[in-house]
Curated annotation (Swiss-Prot):
Gene (UniProt): metG
Recorded GO MF terms: ATP binding; metal ion binding; methionine-tRNA ligase activity; tRNA binding
Family to which the UniProt record says this protein belongs: Belongs to the class-I aminoacyl-tRNA synthetase family. MetG type 1 subfamily.
Cellular component terms per the entry's GO annotation: cytosol
Protein known as: Methionine--tRNA ligase
CDD domains according to UniProt: Anticodon_Ia_Met, MetRS_core, tRNA_bind_EcMetRS_like
Organism: Cupriavidus taiwanensis (strain DSM 17343 / BCRC 17206 / CCUG 44338 / CIP 107171 / LMG 19424 / R1)
Cofactor: Zn(2+)
Subunit field text: Homodimer.
Cofactor mode of binding and number, as noted: Binds 1 zinc ion per subunit.
Length: 688
């Protein structure tokens, strides 16, 4: 069979913060798939980079009193360390602030311009007179022009779901300085995504997307065929001061970070190609026969399934073979929380002495090919790792290896290896391979654990520890241990993409060459004696998990001073003082979320049915879809403004407002967080 040629990427982490376990879901998912492809003998390259440009990086560097270059170099070192610690096997880990990326950005931009897909338009924007800079959407807040909700971002209202341009905001203020912005006009450059050529191409391209959820979401964005296009042109420029690449022929104008970030995939691969003598153009040119896959979070699907493929198609490059999106990580059923210690950084996990392969295995045991969210239940984490990896898998080797080494000089009984159990394990190879290929890791590991149970049942039946007591059963002992260790070798092949360090230890102990998928048709040989058994993995101790949570709770206090320095970017100014009489007008009540569902036609709103202890339920729309799934909210208690006048919206009448917290700068502190009363509160209780 001809080897496939595959280019694989994960999304680029932003160079403005630490890697945490939520990030690691994606990199572990990608790495498992890449390692499997390598084991299959395919030519696969896995590339990544830090996403380094944009206003948040520029402002953070300014606050730290260093250059943006110094900041991104430091963060790159930290990110690379974390990926190495979790065995993420990039062939090249690079930076978007690289000459290869500058050249590719300019080349793609000029090609799109030659295709008449770049338009120049005057745009009126808010300008911070204190910082002397134009303000991106997320660096402006004010009152929603439709419902009047305060402290809404410059692009959409999280209360009523309305979208708008920043200049529509009432009483706007700069998140950077707190100043009232002024309006200024500026020439901006747009990628004409609304061009009929782009729409026609995207309708054709979406048909090949593997994930139904992604295809359905794209159909929503594209609208019904035959109707007027719902696609909007994309502003790809930003004004100075800005940390990024200047647009050729446009002094003082810079490529928007979301243009140069995905091009960074190609820049990283080009840098690798130069190192290894790979024909870059043969891999990424329009007639390439290679495959190209992007693993991403579902929150950036829009950029990877609309802008990115259209940019490539009309600038003379091949388009992605597919885009694989995953869901978000929760911990113990809730969003990661610094106060609870569940906002766990990659470095703290390693510093606590936790084994990275424990987390790799647990994530794999929960991951599938869908975009559904994944929950790290810490009690289940301890139980599953200790049961599956230690109690079932590693236990096989520890029960058989000692007898084989001591009694038979480590030499297997080759004649015994024609056992039906081993044939059963080999017959599962195509199914395990199919499940890895299709990213159904949880099903793959479930099947492998079923096979592991069968091997343990064989060991329990043969009882080598009993056979060893009877010299007359020496041959039976030899056969039982030989079959057990050959079965262990086969199971290791199936688990190697997930636990590569354990697999390397097994290869040393079994005295075999590095295991790939072809090794399934081979077997242990008496000519290569098994070596003395060495412990492959220790059990998870609950005290380690407790220490990990404590370390991350402490990190919140330890970083309080740096966080204060970032306050201008992350936390908006305190509102004007009010009297106690003003506050008394607001009736805050505890409410139970009885039902919850997504609002058709909106990617921001959830429709909640709330019980406020009134003998009836209320209908409330809330712009929290980016942070919660309906399943996560049903049954929870929350806090509602109960005496807010009902508001008629596009999707129905909203009879209140659910309270939620967020930072001003979601790059620095991403997320929305609903308020949850402590246990004991009941629907209808007043808060005051």
């Amino acid at each position: 069979m001809t080897a496939r040629r595959i280019l694989v990427t994960s999304a680029l982490p932003y160079a403005n913060g630490q890697i945490h376990i939520g990030h690691l879901v994606e990199y572990i998912q990608t790495d498992i798939w890449v390692r499997f492809q390598r084991m299959m003998g395919n030519e696969v390259y896995y590339v990544g980079a830090d996403d380094t440009h944009g206003t948040p990086v520029m402002l953070r560097a300014e606050k730290e009193g260093i250059t943006p270059k110094a900041l991104i170099d430091r963060v790159w070192t930290e990110h690379k360390r974390d990926f190495d610690s979790f065995l993420v096997s990039f062939d090249n880990y690079y930076s978007t602030d690289a000459e290869e990326n500058r050249e590719l950005c300019e080349k793609i931009y000029l090609a799109l311009k030659a295709e008449d897909l770049i338009a120049e338009r005057e745009v009126e924007q808010f300008y911070d007179p204190v910082k002397n800079m134009f303000l991106p959407d997320r660096f402006i807040k004010g009152e929603c022009p439709k419902c009047g909700a305060k402290d809404q971002y410059g692009d959409s209202c999280e209360v009523c779901g309305t979208t708008y341009v920043p200049t529509d905001l009432k009483n706007p203020y700069s998140v950077v300085s707190g100043a009232t912005p002024v309006r200024k006009s500026s020439a901006h450059y747009f990628f004409k995504l609304s061009d009929p050529r782009c729409e026609s191409f995207l309708r054709e391209w979406v048909a090949d997307l593997a994930q139904p959820e992604a295809a359905n979401k794209m159909q929503e964005w594209l609208g019904a065929e035959g109707e007027a296009s719902t696609l909007s042109d994309w502003d790809i420029s930003r004004d100075a001061p800005y940390f990024g690449f200047e647009i050729p022929g446009a002094p003082g104008k810079y490529f928007y970070v979301w243009l140069d970030a995905p091009i960074g995939y190609y820049a990283s691969f080009k840098n690798l190609a130069q190192q290894r003598g790979i024909d870059f153009d043969a891999w990424v040119g329009p007639h390439s026969t290679a495959e190209q896959y992007h693993f991403i979070g579902k929150d950036i699907l829009y950029f990877h399934t609309l802008f990115w493929p259209a940019m490539l198609r009309f600038s003379g490059y091949r388009t992605p073979t597919n885009v694989f999106a995953h869901g978000f990580l929760t911990v113990d059923g809730a969003k990661m929380s610094k106060s609870r210690g569940t906002f766990i950084t990659a470095q703290s996990y390693i510093d606590t002495g936790m084994n990275p392969e424990w987390l790799r295995y647990y994530f794999a045991a929960k991951l599938n090919a869908s975009m559904e969210d994944l929950d790290l239940n810490l009690d289940d984490f301890i139980a599953r790792v200790n049961s599956d990896l230690i109690g079932k898998y590693v236990n096989i080797a520890s029960r058989a290896a000692g007898f084989l080494v001591k009694r038979f000089d480590g030499k297997v009984d080759e004649a015994a290896l024609a056992h039906p159990l081993l044939e059963q394990l080999r017959e599962a190879a195509p199914q395990v391979a199919h499940l890895y290929e299709s990213r159904e890791y949880s099903k793959a590991l479930r099947l492998v654990m079923e096979l592991t149970d069968a091997v343990n049942a064989f060991v329990d039946t043969e009882k080598p520890w009993e056979l060893a007591k009877d010299d007359g059963k020496r041959a039976a002992l030899h056969a039982a241990c030989s079959v057990s260790l050959e079965a262990f070798r086969l199971l290791t092949i199936y688990l190697k993409p997930v636990v590569p360090n354990v697999a390397a230890g097994v290869e040393r102990f079994l005295n075999v060459a590095p295991l790939d998928w072809r090794a399934i048709d081979q077997q242990l040989s008496a000519a290569s004696p098994v070596q003395p058994y060495q412990h492959l993995m220790t059990r998870v101790d609950a005290k380690q998990v407790d220490a990990l949570l404590a370390a991350n709770r402490e990190s919140l206090q330890a970083t309080a001073a740096p966080a204060a320095a970032d306050a201008a970017a992350a936390i908006e100014p305190i509102a004007d003082t009010i009297t106690i009489d003003d506050f008394a007008k607001i009736d805050l009540r505890v409410a139970k979320i009885v039902e919850c569902q997504k609002v058709e036609g909106s990617n921001k709103l959830l429709q909640l049915t709330l019980d406020l202890g009134e003998g009836r339920t209320r209908n409330v729309f809330s712009g929290i879809q980016s942070a919660y799934t309906p399943e996560q909210l049903v049954g929870k208690l929350t806090v509602v403004v109960a005496n807010l006048a009902p508001r008629k919206m596009k999707f129905g009448v909203s009879e209140g407002m659910v309270l939620a917290a967020s930072a001003a700068d979601e790059k620095t502190a991403p997320g929305l967080y609903i308020l949850e009363p402590h246990s004991g509160a009941v629907p209808g209780m007043r808060i005051g």
